């Protein structure tokens, strides 16, 4: 026997195993009516309590939402909001918020934007992550057009995402006493440590003829510019919230919070909405009833199917593997 044939037979023998021939022991359960009913029953018993727990946690979150984009435009300028927001008029606006239930600290301050598509492909691609991490890559601005360079020098951070940084501001007072907003650690720690360099500083940012949003302090590294870090984590949906800061004191029921805000950010060009949100959190996060409702819905459907199949099984039992149900054993009149 030649060496070639010997090797061929050896390879064939080595591949002729229970694994390659798919002969390993396996569990192949048969979906009998009892197993189907039991599966739906267990699923319903598990999902419904989970839904109640999640919904209860969500309902425990206290949230105050105040839409201000329209109310902070003077009546005389509401016919042309874009011209007002792009003008030089004073954009200060006073708002009053009443706390309906006691809010334990920390109270999170968010800004909410609607009809704002941060997931647009051209918008998302208009950034340079390498430039954010290292000063060696500050000239890598090819993907940032049109906000890539100014007078032949690179813009740091470049791109439309950074250029459109949210620039409304909020100042809170209660009983004529200022409520400080803590803006430390509002961004992800992993972003601060790995995505934004400690030796990368803003350059030529918001210095062009068109100003998109907030300016950055050129003496503070990007790793400490937490408003920017929060903004650069783009949202997947057109309605989103981003963390503005934290109030590290309790807000009592009945408290009146006065807000002095600067209505600078232009959402009027695309019919967007702006809202100020004060919220507590639970072990599950912020207020979101969807998860609890989803669990309750799926659990209820599973219980309904379990009961329905049980009734059908008891009313019209059918022997498993009955050959009389085979097509060739049925009568010519349509069978059973």
From Swiss-Prot:
Expression across tissues: Expressed in flowers. May be restricted to pollen grains.
Region of interest (Disordered), ranges: 127-148
Topological relation to the membrane, as annotated: Multi-pass membrane protein
UniProt KW keywords: Glycoprotein, Membrane, Transmembrane, Transmembrane helix
Compositional bias annotation for Basic and acidic residues: 127-142
Glycosylation sites per record: 94, 167, 329
One GO term describing the cellular component: nucleus
Subcellular location, principal: membrane
Localization annotation: Membrane
Record-linked InterPro entries: CDC50/LEM3_fam
Family under the similarity heading: Belongs to the CDC50/LEM3 family.
Name of the featured protein: Putative ALA-interacting subunit 4
């Amino acid at each position: 026997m030649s060496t070639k044939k010997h090797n061929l037979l050896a390879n064939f023998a080595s591949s002729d195993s229970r694994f390659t021939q798919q002969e390993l022991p396996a569990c192949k359960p048969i979906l009998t009516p009892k197993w189907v009913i039991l599966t739906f029953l267990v699923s319903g018993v598990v999902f419904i309590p989970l839904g109640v727990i999640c919904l209860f946690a969500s309902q425990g979150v206290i949230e105050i939402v105040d839409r201000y984009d329209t109310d902070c435009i003077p009546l005389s300028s509401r016919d042309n909001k874009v011209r007002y927001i792009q003008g030089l008029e004073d954009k200060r606006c006073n708002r009053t918020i009443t706390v309906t239930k006691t809010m334990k600290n920390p109270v999170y301050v968010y800004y909410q934007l609607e009809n704002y598509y941060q997931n647009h492909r051209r918008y998302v691609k208009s950034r340079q992550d390498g430039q954010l991490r290292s000063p060696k890559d500050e000239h890598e601005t090819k993907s940032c057009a049109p906000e890539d360079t100014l007078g032949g020098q690179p813009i740091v951070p470049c791109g439309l995402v950074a250029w459109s940084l949210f620039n409304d501001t909020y100042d809170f007072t209660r009983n004529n006493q200022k409520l400080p907003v803590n803006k430390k650690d509002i961004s992800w720690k992993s972003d601060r440590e790995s995505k934004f360099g400690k030796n990368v500083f803003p350059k030529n940012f918001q210095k062009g003829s068109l100003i998109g949003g907030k300016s950055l302090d050129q003496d503070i590294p990007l790793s400490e510019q937490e408003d920017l870090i929060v903004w650069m984590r783009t949202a997947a949906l057109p309605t989103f919230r981003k963390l503005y800061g934290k109030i590290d004191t309790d807000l009592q029921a009945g408290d009146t919070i006065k807000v002095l805000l600067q209505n600078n950010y232009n959402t009027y060009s695309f019919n967007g909405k702006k809202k100020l949100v004060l919220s507590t959190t639970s072990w599950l996060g912020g207020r979101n009833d969807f998860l609890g409702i989803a669990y309750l819905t799926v659990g209820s459907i599973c219980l309904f199917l379990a009961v329905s199949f049980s009734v059908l099984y008891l009313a019209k039992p059918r022997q498993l593997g009955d050959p009389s149900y085979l097509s060739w054993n049925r009568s010519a009149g349509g069978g059973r």
